């Protein structure tokens, strides 16, 4: 899906530079993404040139899902096509899983706790996992930047590590037991190695430090204050499916607890646009914390804390889980944000293509 996302981004950025500097008075009125913004049911008028570029890209790639682009606080392009698992039409308000885009929320939660003086990214893991033999070697910062050396928990051979027949706690305990028994793949802070296990452990640290369930801390700290009323976690679907009507829990293809911190968020275009603006503007976390998120700790791959940093002049993250693929993007220089989600692009390479092309068009 990366290729598709690239197409979307290139299309939008090219057109925005060419046609949006003066703006469109009819499209400016209703698309500010302040923290107190309420869910809108009527979409503002899109910029004709940018919308045309997006529509062409979507047609060429037979893209199904949602795209939402905002420049200078104004919606400039939107797209919604396809069906949810229950047959309902996909709309801009349809919540869908965002996969690894979830890592931004986990990184922000850790940094917020640091702002509150409750932890430090320089803490070593033995402070939180006394049973971990390598705990003294690895810091929270190593987890955030994917430089811990901890082997991936979902590697081949671990298919029976977790199960839908087990509770979330049982699965979490099983994963931790396995992780803490393994040797490191490499010394900490020597190599970037993308692994979900890093953010899985971070979510557990958030729970320990806050004294709350991870999702409860996210809701209290981010979702509720930012009026992200269509955002929650995969684990909430079986007991509270109404807020994400149309989603099939089985299509997410995960077991309770497995995605904690690393791929557990479900959201929609409005909430994700609010989120990425709040994240970069100092509303969700401090400016200093956001700077830490977007600092390059791995020049070979350009990764910060839950953010890839070298995407057409901006930052963002790709996500893929089950049948869903997503992408969010922030370009502070051009004051442009983008969110893409699909329930038909099962391979990450597909959404990458969409984003690459859309960004090219927007950047012209």
Residue map of PLM features:
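Short, surface-exposed loop or secondary-structure junction motifs
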Residues: 138-322, 326-327
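Hydrophobic (often cysteine-bearing) scaffold residues that line and stabilize catalytic clefts
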Residues: 46, 50, 98, 102, ...
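Short active-site loop at a secondary-structure junction
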Residues: 64, 86-143, 186-195, 260-263, ...
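C-terminal motif of bacterial Sec signal peptides marking the signal peptidase cleavage site
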Residues: 16-19
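Catalytic loop of the DD-peptidase/beta-lactamase superfamily, centered on the K-T-G motif
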Residues: 22-24, 28, 36, 40-80, ...
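Positively charged n-region of N-terminal signal peptides that target proteins for export
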Residues: 1-4, 8
């Amino acid at each position: 899906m990366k290729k598709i996302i690239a197409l979307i981004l290139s299309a939008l950025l090219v057109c925005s530079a060419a046609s949006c500097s003066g703006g469109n008075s009819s499209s400016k009125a209703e698309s500010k993404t302040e923290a107190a913004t309420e869910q809108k049911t009527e979409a503002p008028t899109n910029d004709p040139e940018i919308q045309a570029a997006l529509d062409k890209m979507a047609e060429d790639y037979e893209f199904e899902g949602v795209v939402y682009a905002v420049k200078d606080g104004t919606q400039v392009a939107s797209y919604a096509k396809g069906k949810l698992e229950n047959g309902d039409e996909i709309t801009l308000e349809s919540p869908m899983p965002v996969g690894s885009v979830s890592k931004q929320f986990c990184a922000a939660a850790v940094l917020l706790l640091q702002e509150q003086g409750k932890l430090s990214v320089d803490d070593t893991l033995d402070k939180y996992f006394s049973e971990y033999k390598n705990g003294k070697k690895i810091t929270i910062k190593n987890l955030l930047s994917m430089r811990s050396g901890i082997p991936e928990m979902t590697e081949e051979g671990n298919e029976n590590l977790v199960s839908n027949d087990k509770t979330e706690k049982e699965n979490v305990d099983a994963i931790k037991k396995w992780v803490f028994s393994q040797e490191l793949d490499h010394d900490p802070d020597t190599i970037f190695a993308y692994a979900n296990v890093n953010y899985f452990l971070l979510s557990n640290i958030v729970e320990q430090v806050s004294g709350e369930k991870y999702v409860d801390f996210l809701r209290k700290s981010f979702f509720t204050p930012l009026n992200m009323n269509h955002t929650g976690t995969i684990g909430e679907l079986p007991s509270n499916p109404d807020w994400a009507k149309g989603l099939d829990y089985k299509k997410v293809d995960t077991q309770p607890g497995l995605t904690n911190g690393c791929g557990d968020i479900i959201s929609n275009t409005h909430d994700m646009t609010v989120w990425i603006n709040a994240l970069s503007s100092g509303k969700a976390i401090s400016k200093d914390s956001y700077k830490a998120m977007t600092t390059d700790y791995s020049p070979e791959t350009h990764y910060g804390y839950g953010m890839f940093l070298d995407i057409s002049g901006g930052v963002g993250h790709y996500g893929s889980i089950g049948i869903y693929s997503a992408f969010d993007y922030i370009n502070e220089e051009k004051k442009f944000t983008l969110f893409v989600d699909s329930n038909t692009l099962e391979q990450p390479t597909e959404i990458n293509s969409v984003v690459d092309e859309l960004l090219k068009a927007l950047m012209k």
